[in-house]
Amino acid sequence: MSRFWNNVVKFPRFLVSVILGLILTIISPFFVLFRKPSTSFFFIISFTGLLVVLTAIIKKMLNIECC
């Protein structure tokens, strides 16, 4: 029975390692952009603009009014 529980405990650790590996694989190309100041600046501006647009879209979709 202890062998069964040892096998069951392995799966959550495997899931966490797969998710972390996927996140690092997706994010790692963006770290290259931060090496040069000019590309870093444009990346930050683009990311901020994307967040603003997504926030506005979600607020309109959910009919959320601020203040």
UniProtKB/Swiss-Prot annotation:
Keywords: Chloroplast, Plastid. It is found in: Plastid, Chloroplast. Pfam families: DUF751. InterPro entries: Uncharacterised_Ycf33. One of its GO terms (cellular component) is chloroplast. Belongs to the ycf33 family. This is Uncharacterized protein ycf33. It comes from Porphyra purpurea (Red seaweed).
